[in-house]
Amino acid sequence: MARIAGVDLPRDKRIVIGLTYIFGIGNTTAQKILANAGVSEDIRVRDLTPDQEEKIRAEVDQIKVEGDLRREVSLNIKRLQEIGSYRGMRHRHGLPVRGQHTKNNARTRKGKAVAIAGKKK
């Protein structure tokens, strides 16, 4: 099993799909990494040679991924909260940040619906 950026990539998947298991690498970024490393997208993770793994690791090391990226995102959110911006307040209260309506929906962000006591006839 190939281990890149601290993540074990699934052996049976194509390398372009396997790279997307790393936080911060999507499909487009995975394709660019493989193009720069000179590795075919169709090769399976289990079929990678050690030389190809090293080339991919070198490319991934140039990108901010996993822990560093998670830390940066959390610091950005914390900064928004500290300066008291509208977006920071929405993060603090657990509401949608990007202008979505919340009258009926937004259950994912607001959590499970809580019944109001005394609402019966």
UniProtKB/Swiss-Prot annotation:
InterPro entries: Rbsml_uS13_C, Ribosomal_uS13, Ribosomal_uS13-like_H2TH, Ribosomal_uS13_bac-type, Ribosomal_uS13_CS. Residues 90-121 are annotated as: Disordered. Signal peptide: none annotated. GO terms for cellular component: cytosol; small ribosomal subunit. Keywords: Ribonucleoprotein, Ribosomal protein, RNA-binding, rRNA-binding, tRNA-binding. Pfam families: Ribosomal_S13. One of its GO terms (biological process) is translation. GO terms for molecular function: rRNA binding; structural constituent of ribosome; tRNA binding. Belongs to the universal ribosomal protein uS13 family. Part of the 30S ribosomal subunit. Forms a loose heterodimer with protein S19. Forms two bridges to the 50S subunit in the 70S ribosome. Located at the top of the head of the 30S subunit, it contacts several helices of the 16S rRNA. In the 70S ribosome it contacts the 23S rRNA (bridge B1a) and protein L5 of the 50S subunit (bridge B1b), connecting the 2 subunits; these bridges are implicated in subunit movement. Contacts the tRNAs in the A and P-sites. NCBIfam families: uS13_bact. This is Small ribosomal subunit protein uS13. It comes from Limosilactobacillus fermentum (strain NBRC 3956 / LMG 18251) (Lactobacillus fermentum). The lineage of its organism: Bacteria, Bacillati, Bacillota, Bacilli, Lactobacillales. The gene is rpsM.
